[in-house]
Curated annotation (Swiss-Prot):
One Pfam match: Rhodopsin_N
Role played: Photoreceptor required for image-forming vision at low light intensity. While most salt water fish species use retinal as chromophore, most freshwater fish use 3-dehydroretinal, or a mixture of retinal and 3-dehydroretinal. Light-induced isomerization of 11-cis to all-trans retinal triggers a conformational change that activates signaling via G-proteins. Subsequent receptor phosphorylation mediates displacement of the bound G-protein alpha subunit by arrestin and terminates signaling.
Subcellular location per the Swiss-Prot or TrEMBL entry: Membrane; Cell projection, Cilium, Photoreceptor outer segment
Name of the featured protein: Rhodopsin
Lineage summary: Eukaryota, Metazoa, Chordata, Craniata, Vertebrata
Main location as per UniProt: membrane
Organism per entry: Zeus faber
Segments for region (Disordered): 333-354
Length: 354
């Protein structure tokens, strides 16, 4: 084994010199330069500084403007709530521990940080799945005359919480566990050991199949079908400029959605799977730290991709920030009108760019 395993931790360094200590009790400055911990703390501060206002503003603007309280926006609000869970329950803890150079909050703090980070990430992931399914059902119409209503939105939100808890709760009760990872300042699922009594192997396989591979497959399938439907509609109305514009808008949205998901989560999932399947191989603390901390940036990407690209929401947000007036009223109004025209045109071919 190319690491040191303790009762509730795994440090990626062989303890041949006797310097390895528990990440709950001692600074881990022997792993990397102490300046690296300061950089992590600064990075987490940046995510908090940006992530909290953006996601809180999403909730506040939606509550202030009744026209934004649509069934589909329930899912988008759920996404913002998930991001706030990550910011408040995970990012603040990680920033604090990074400032100290070890997981100063102890085993209980590790469980809480790992739980909130996993819960928030999974709620966000399954919210994206619900959005993908909603777009596929409404746009491609595999079910005739289906209308996405408030009841469907509530069921979708409940589903995201159910699936998120199915992934984040078991490690609290003995099916796998949360341990410090990377530079030992943040906690995650134990991919590193086969500790007796925790059944890490079965949980990691369950998590990768049910909470990564399946959601990714659903997202690709739904948005793939959506893109095909938009292209078919555009081909049938090649002389319609509004339809062509709608095709470009939907294509851009789909590409950004898929790329954003992959950029945030694929590096972390790939490294975690590599560590799980190559237990005993040599790897440094930075090997897991970089993708783990990069995945946390999804709390910023999500609202920008799924909320700020919505013209109506952007108009309401500017109105709120500017004390009830939108200084870009004419430009935003023209843009919103064009968007509505595109939606109406493409709707006649059973496609909507929203």
């Amino acid at each position: 084994m190319n690491g040191t395993e303790g009762p509730d931790f795994y440090v990626p360094m062989v303890n041949t010199t006797g310097i390895v200590r528990s990440p709950y009790d001692y600074p881990q400055y022997y792993l990397v330069n102490p300046a690296a911990f300061s950089m992590l703390a600064a990075y987490m501060f940046f995510l908090i500084l940006v992530g909290f206002p953006v996601n809180f503003l999403t909730l506040y603007v939606t509550m202030e403007h009744k026209k934004l309280r649509t069934p589909l926006n329930y899912i988008l609000l759920n996404l913002a709530v998930a991001n706030l869970f990550m910011v408040i329950g995970g990012f603040t803890t990680t920033m604090y521990t990074s400032m100290h150079g070890y997981f100063v909050l102890g085993r209980t703090g590790c469980n809480l940080e790992g739980f909130f980070a996993t819960l928030g990430g999974e709620i966000a992931l399954w919210s994206l799945v619900v959005l993908a399914v909603e777009r596929w059902v409404v746009v491609c119409k595999p079910i005739s005359n289906f209308r996405f209503g408030e009841n469907h939105a509530v069921m979708g939100v409940s589903f995201t919480w159910l699936m998120a808890c199915a992934c984040s709760v078991p490690p609290l009760f003995g099916w796998s566990r949360y341990i410090p990872e990377g530079m030992q300042c943040s906690c995650g699922i134990d991919y590193y050991t086969r500790a007796p009594g925790y059944n890490n192997e079965s949980f990691v396989i369950y998590m990768f199949v049910c909470h990564f591979s399946i959601p990714l497959t659903i997202i690709f399938f739904c948005y793939g079908r959506l893109l095909c439907a938009v292209k078919d509609a555009a081909a049938a109305q090649q002389e319609s400029e509004t339809t062509q514009r709608a095709e470009r808008e939907v294509s851009r949205m789909v590409v950004i959605m898929v790329i954003g998901f992959l950029i945030c989560w694929l590096p972390y999932a790939s490294v975690a799977w590599f560590i799980f399947t190559h237990q005993g191989s040599e790897f440094g603390p930075v090997f897991m730290t970089i993708p783990a901390f990069f995945a946390k940036s999804s709390a910023i990407y999500n609202p920008m991709i799924y909320i700020c690209m919505n013209k109506q929401f952007r108009h309401c947000m500017i109105t709120t920030l500017c004390c009830g007036k939108n200084p870009f009223e004419e430009e935003e109004g023209a843009s919103t009108t064009a968007s509505k025209t595109e939606a109406s045109s493409v709707s006649s071919s059973h496609v909507s760019p929203a």
